[in-house]
């Protein structure tokens, strides 16, 4: 896929990524308004990749293979698309779902497409002293290892949540634009280095 950005074999642009690490986008959540009322039962009966169990959840769950995604389609015409690995693929998938709904006889449009959340991840390749980090950044951190093994770091600017694991694996969530994911990681990277665990 051409849209995967800087991941892979190309050299990293150090002006944008001084750490030399580019977080990989793992999941994009987007929404769009099909702008018409939908008969979910009819959609579930006619579309072969759809399931609908109104007692469990008030939406049709539909999946496509390319781009590998899942859509939640509501009777109001609102749709949520998850699972794409880039913004471009998320929009492409959402358009495919809209087209499926159109082919089933609904006057579906494609209004107000919006990226709602970008989840990225990376590995700094060194272990991190989470206790020390949590203590010195207590205003932004919550770390309760008996409940969850990662430290939850709530960055203010950009407004992003990072899950930081002792292994050096990082999950970055809450961005609406990939640049926020990258900025958040570059902001936290010096802190991670400061709390690098020294191997005995």
Swiss-Prot record:
It is found in: Nucleus. Gene3D superfamilies: TATA-Binding Protein (3.30.310.10). One of its GO terms (molecular function) is DNA binding. Changing residue 144 to R: Unable to bind to TFIIB1. InterPro entries: TBP, TBP_CS, TBP_dom_sf, TBP_eukaryotic. Keywords: Activator, DNA-binding, Nucleus, Repeat, Transcription, Transcription regulation. GO terms for biological process: DNA-templated transcription initiation. Changing residue 146 to R: Unable to bind to TFIIB1. GO terms for cellular component: nucleus. Sequence repeats lie at residues 25-101, 115-192. Belongs to the TFIID complex together with the TBP-associated factors (TAFs). Binds DNA as monomer. Interacts with TAF1 (via N-terminus). Interacts with TFIIB1. Interacts with PTF2. Interacts with HAT5/ATHB-1 and ATHB-7. Component of a nuclear protein complex containing at least TATA binding proteins (TBPs, e.g. TBP1 and TBP2) and ATX1. Belongs to the TBP family. General transcription factor (GTF) that functions at the core of the DNA-binding multiprotein factor TFIID. Binding of TFIID to the TATA box is the initial transcriptional step of the pre-initiation complex (PIC), playing a role in the activation of eukaryotic genes transcribed by RNA polymerase II. Interacts with TFIIB1 and is required for activated transcription and possibly basal transcription. May act as GTF of RNA polymerase I-dependent transcription and rRNA synthesis. Forms a ternary complex with PBRP1 and the rDNA promoter region. This is TATA-box-binding protein 2. The lineage of its organism: Eukaryota, Viridiplantae, Streptophyta, Embryophyta, Tracheophyta. The gene is TBP2.
């Amino acid at each position: 896929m051409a849209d995967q950005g800087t991941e892979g074999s190309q050299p990293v642009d150090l002006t944008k990524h001084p750490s030399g690490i580019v977080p990989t986008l793992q999941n994009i959540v987007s929404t769009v308004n099909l702008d018409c009322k939908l008969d979910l039962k009819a959609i579930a009966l006619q579309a072969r990749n759809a399931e609908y169990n109104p007692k469990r959840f008030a939406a049709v769950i539909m999946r496509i293979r390319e781009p590998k995604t899942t859509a939640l389609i509501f009777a109001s015409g609102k749709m949520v698309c998850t699972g794409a690995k880039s913004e471009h693929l998320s929009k492409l998938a959402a358009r495919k779902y809209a087209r499926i709904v159109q082919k089933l006889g609904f006057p579906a449009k494609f209004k107000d497409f919006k990226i709602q959340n970008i989840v990225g991840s990376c590995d700094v390749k060194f272990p991190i002293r989470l206790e020390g980090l949590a203590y010195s950044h207590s205003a932004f951190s919550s770390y309760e290892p008996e409940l969850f093994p990662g430290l939850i770091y709530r960055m203010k600017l950009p407004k992003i949540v990072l899950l930081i694991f002792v292994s050096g694996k990082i999950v970055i969530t809450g961005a609406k634009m990939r640049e926020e994911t990258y900025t958040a990681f570059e902001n936290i990277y010096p802190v991670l280095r400061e709390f690098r665990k020294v191997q005995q």
